[in-house]
């Protein structure tokens, strides 16, 4: 797009020292897009961000980190996609635990492409609405949001029209009922 070479890699490609992202930048990529389906883990959010920030700074290119959101079987994907500029600073943070579409303007330094072949895409440039970054959740909020999303997606993807919650009256039952209501509604 306007002579900007974009390196696209998948999941763990971004973590590999001298891996695909490094090779893409050496070949002339001015922007890296990393596509993920990284499951939720209470300790993963900060680790992801730190590693991508360090990689962007090292390579001196912006990185768009896209992560899947939703429940799938026993896994919950927390989303939380983000954009890091070439200095390693997060300039946009998407919501966690909910689907979202976002667009943004991003300044990139056009580099010479060091490759014999390239794919050129012509993209129509429309006026882009202003974005609002979203907060990330603390550990307790993250766990609760993951539970809600997992329950809601499981019920929706299995096309259940009703659910039955068995309660014994203890604190675990209170939490189960609260998660069910927050995820599915009180009906």
Which residue ranges define each predicted feature?
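ATP-dependent adenylation/nucleotidyltransferase module used to activate substrates
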Residues: 13, 137-187
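Beta-strand-turn-beta hairpins that frame and shape the catalytic cleft
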Residues: 1-8
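Generic beta-strand/beta-sheet core signal
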Residues: 9, 34-35, 64-66, 84, ...
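Conserved hydrophobic/aromatic beta-strand scaffold that supports enzyme active sites
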Residues: 8, 83, 101-105
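Internal active-site segments that recognize and position negatively charged phosphoryl groups
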Residues: 8, 14-15
């Amino acid at each position: 797009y306007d002579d900007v070479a974009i390196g696209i890699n998948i999941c763990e490609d971004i973590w590999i020292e001298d891996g695909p992202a490094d090779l893409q930048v050496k070949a002339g990529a001015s922007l890296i897009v990393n596509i993920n389906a990284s499951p939720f883990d209470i300790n993963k959010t900060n680790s992801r961000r730190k590693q991508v920030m360090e990689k962007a700074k090292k390579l001196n290119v912006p990185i768009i980190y896209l992560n899947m959101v939703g429940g799938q079987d026993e896994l919950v994907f927390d989303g939380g996609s983000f954009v890091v500029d070439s200095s390693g600073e997060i300039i946009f943070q998407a919501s966690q635990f909910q689907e979202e579409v976002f667009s943004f303007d991003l300044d990139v330094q056009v580099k010479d492409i060091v490759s014999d072949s390239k794919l050129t895409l012509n993209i129509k440039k429309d006026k882009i609405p202003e974005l609002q970054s979203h907060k990330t959740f603390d550990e307790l909020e993250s766990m609760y949001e993951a539970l809600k999303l997992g329950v809601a997606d499981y019920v929706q993807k299995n096309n259940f029209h009703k659910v039955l919650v068995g309660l014994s009256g203890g604190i675990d039952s209170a939490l189960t009922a609260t998660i069910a209501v927050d995820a599915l509604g009180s009906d």
